[in-house]
Amino acid sequence: MTYGEFLKKLIIFTNTKIMVIANETGYDISYISKWCNKGILPTTRTISVINKKLSKVFANEIVMQDRVEDFFISFSDMIEKKETDTENLFDFLSDSIETALSVCYRHSSTQ
């Protein structure tokens, strides 16, 4: 899966507005849209910070919407479900999403 495809899937699944993502990452909406739809990638210099911020936004939405089980079903091709206590759930989700975003970024940057 490409970076843009995975990002778009996360946005749709969590129903997160692009404006929220733009505010959290500090990037204009047009950049976010290009990442999702045009195959344009963030720079390698900034990707780790962007992925960390994005993963926290999505993990928070998943927990707040009580969609953890749905998330693991919908993203089973990218993220393996592991037993974790509810106290560490946000961190686990955030780390898993960040890792998956990084994998997709590497895959996309070599195409």
For each of these PLM feature ranges, what is it?
Residues 46-110:
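Short amphipathic recognition helices of helix-turn-helix/homeodomain-type DNA-binding modules
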Residues 11, 22, 51, 55:
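The alpha-helix within a helix-turn-helix
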Residues 7, 18, 29, 47, ...:
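Helix-turn-helix DNA-binding elements, focusing on the entry/boundary residues of the two helices
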Residues 24-31, 69-73:
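A short glycine/small-residue-enriched secondary-structure motif
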Residues 1-18, 24:
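A short, Lys/Arg-rich alpha-helix, primarily the initiator
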Residues 26-43:
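Recognition helix of helix-turn-helix/homeodomain-like DNA-binding domains
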